[in-house]
UniProtKB/Swiss-Prot annotation:
Catalytic activity reported: (S)-4-amino-5-oxopentanoate = 5-aminolevulinate
Pfam families hit by this protein: Aminotran_3
Pathway: Porphyrin-containing compound metabolism; protoporphyrin-IX biosynthesis; 5-aminolevulinate from L-glutamyl-tRNA(Glu): step 2/2
UniProt-recorded name of the protein: Glutamate-1-semialdehyde 2,1-aminomutase
Length: 431
């Protein structure tokens, strides 16, 4: 009789009570061909420990929030102090004001901000606000960019970029997504064609300025600046979804790196320090349309709760210290350089890239440009699955999808990075 791990046993039990056994699909490890996910018992610093007491170097960081590493002492202390004063009030608190001020200080394109409970809520609310502000209904998103699971975002491109979006999940009515237009990332021709066809109907463009749900694809040839220009020419708004990149690739987010000003920005992940949180903000004249200042409705029972606000305040205080992002970026660069050198040593078709505390792994030659969702689909996805399994078996926890970016924290040591490179080198040698 096969001896099953505690993770296997828990997964079987979970499937009896939770659809698919998980509360977010990617966690099931199905996309990488694994029979079961690892159930985590606890985490500290750069490490995860599963229910079978296996230790992993964690390069997911709860999908981005844990920029300080798990259970940072200062964040924990701040949360513990607040817990004694209450978990949630359903009323305004000083922590909301303090976190809002800190975000606005660090991201100058945000003049006012509204807190919500998730990235999905943030993007959904930003779209509603853009539609109300412009009195238009159509939005443009990009194939491969993920903005949460609101109905208007769950679309796939039809036959060519000029197609109206088609639902890619059952339960999403075609009428809901008929106003969602899908373009190709890094392709201005597809954007120009949409504006030519729907010139006075487009409320906004929403984009991940660095596409972290296509592994990690950077904007090319001033793509973001060109989007800013075409939005200005057509009185449409530009929304940067920085739920992933905000306070992760740089202190001022991707918009500070590319020096492009969005009208609205969505945030999440890092601003909650590991607690559930989201936010959307931007120009004051637009944000003043949000209720109760204006007519655009948005509300939430736990929005701005003092626990999440406290965790966010302490996290932003720490990452805004001089030299933090230099150190974080150096760690990511050390990892990426080591992986690229290892692949080159064995003539293995692989390359990696990074920015700030975020990195991407591509199973193709560095001579092959990966600038779109279609490009990524042409890489060796099966080889990624093999790499994932090998690294997991040897104590390295990577994102369980070739379409997801990875994250490094300030808690990762040189030894952690060197072990990761060593294991990758062995894989490249053997494959």
């Amino acid at each position: 009789m096969e001896n099953k791990s505690n993770s296997q046993i828990l997964f079987a039990e979970a499937q009896q009570y939770i659809p698919g056994g998980v509360n977010s699909p990617v966690r099931a490890f199905k996309s990488v061909g694994q029979e079961f996910p690892r159930f985590i018992k606890f985490a500290k610093g750069a490490y995860l420990y599963d229910v079978d007491w296996n230790k992993y170097i964690d390069y997911i960081g709860s999908w981005g929030p844990m920029i300080l590493g798990h259970c940072d002492d200062d964040v924990l202390e701040a949360i513990q102090c607040q817990v004694k004063n209450g978990l949630s009030y359903g009323a305004p608190c000083k922590q909301e004001v303090d976190l809002a001020k800190k975000i606005i200080e660090l991201m100058p394109n945000i003049e006012q901000v509204r807190f919500v409970n998730s990235g999905t809520e943030a993007t959904m609310s930003a779209i509603r606000l853009a539609r109300a502000y412009t009195c238009r209904n159509k939005i443009i998103k990009f194939e491969g960019c993920y903005h949460g699971h609101a109905d208007e975002f769950l679309v796939a491109a039809g036959s060519g970029a000029l197609s109206l979006g088609q639902p890619n999940s059952p339960g999403v009515p075609e009428d809901v997504v008929k106003d969602t237009l899908v373009a190709s990332f890094n392709d201005m021709e597809s954007i120009q064609a949409l504006f030519e066809k729907y010139k006075d109907e487009i409320a906004c463009i929403i984009i991940e300025p660095i596409a972290g749900n296509m592994n990690m694809i950077f904007p090319q040839d001033d793509f973001l600046a060109k989007l800013r220009a075409i939005c200005d020419q057509n009185s449409s708004l530009l929304i940067f979804d920085e739920v992933m990149t905000g306070f992760r690739v740089a202190l001022g987010g991707a918009q500070s790196i590319y020096n492009v000003k969005p009208d609205l920005t969505t945030l999440g992940k890092v601003i909650g320090g590991g607690m559930p949180v989201g936010a959307f903000g931007g120009r004051k004249e637009i944000m003043q349309k949000v209720s109760p200042a204006g007519p655009v409705y948005q509300a939430g029972t736990l929005s701005g709760n003092p626990i999440a606000m406290t965790a966010g305040i302490k996290t932003l205080e720490k990452i805004s210290q001089p030299g933090f992002f230099d150190e974080l970026g150096a760690k990511a660069q050390k990892l990426v350089d080591g992986l690229n050198e290892a692949a080159k040593a064995y003539d293995f078709n692989f390359h990696a890239k990074c920015l700030g505390g975020m990195f991407g792994l591509f199973f193709c030659s560095d001579k092959i440009a990966v600038n779109t969702f279609v490009d990524l689909g042409k890489t060796n996805l099966k080889m990624f699955n093999q790499f994932f399994a090998y690294m997991l078996d040897n104590g390295v926890y990577l994102a369980p999808s070739a379409y997801e970016a990875g994250f490094i924290s300030i808690a990762h040591s040189d030894e952690d990075i060197e072990k990761t490179i060593y294991l990758a080198k062995k894989f490249f040698q053997e494959n």
